[in-house]
Swiss-Prot record:
Gene3D superfamilies: 1.10.150.130, Intergrase catalytic core (1.10.443.10). GO terms for biological process: cell division; chromosome segregation; DNA transposition. Keywords: Cell cycle, Cell division, Chromosome partition, Cytoplasm, DNA integration, DNA recombination, DNA-binding. Belongs to the 'phage' integrase family. XerC subfamily. Disulfide bonds: none annotated. Its main location: cytoplasm. Residues 106-285 form the Tyr recombinase domain. The lineage of its organism: Bacteria, Pseudomonadati, Pseudomonadota, Gammaproteobacteria, Pseudomonadales. This is Tyrosine recombinase XerC. The active site is at residues 146, 170, 237, 240, 263, 272. SUPFAM superfamilies: DNA breaking-rejoining enzymes (SSF56349). GO terms for molecular function: DNA binding; tyrosine-based site-specific recombinase activity. It comes from Pseudomonas syringae pv. syringae (strain B728a). Forms a cyclic heterotetrameric complex composed of two molecules of XerC and two molecules of XerD.
Amino acid sequence: MDQHLDAYCMHLRSERQVSPHTLEAYRRDLGKVLAYCQKAQVSSWSDLDIQHLRSFTARQHQQGQSSRSLARMLSAVRGFYKYLNREGICQHDPANGLSPPKGERRLPKTLDTDRAAQLLDGGVEDDFLAHRDQAILELLYSSGLRLSELTGLNLDQLDLRDGLVQVLGKGSKTRVLPVGSKARQALEVWLPLRALTNPQDDAVFVSQQGKRLGPRAIQVRLKAAGERELGQNLHPHMLRHSFASHLLESSQDLRAVQELLGHADIKTTQIYTHLDFQHLATVYDSAHPRAKRKGTADD
């Protein structure tokens, strides 16, 4: 079995020309599978089956391997068996149809309401970039837009009189969202400045040369704003997450938040209920007279 693994690594290096880092990762992952085979008395790669791999991945998961790492291992096994089948050594793939154990879903990072206010109420310098960036920040937080929805936004999608914006979301689905008063004010300041650039199209947010802002440009500007006002990294989706979390915290209306975010499946929206519970738990721990406090003895 060792010689087949060595031959595969040689194939990756010479014919596939993978990087040394990638090659080392493949060798390490497949080496763990080989070690398992030796302990499980699997004497050839032909004898390794899906039940063996299920046992292997379960054991690795119990030992602390993340779902992402296990997915990478299974990908390495599939690539290895594709090679073995092509070389006539095996006629099967034990990893076919096998998925790694699901890990805990990471909670999205958000700003609390005080930090959001600190970001948005920090004061705006009277210049083109500052007013544009303020309008971007306010709209992202006010309406919960995705970055792609913001960059694709055109003038005819804005209705500042009624405080509405129409966006084109995933799957080319449109939805109409409210625009808060602060965002409306910021946009009313920004749009006359935008017109001075002689814009090349109907994009709401443009550069000083009148070109539509792309995702990367907005990410860079938000990162700078976060470091300046909050001393932390800030990305567009953090404002969308904050919008959803704060709205759910205040309204407790999961369906309404789902509609505003444009989620096809409410399960996607339910991640924000975990954030809300975390907030409530923090409030409870700090405010309830019989909550456990750090540094106090149990009575």
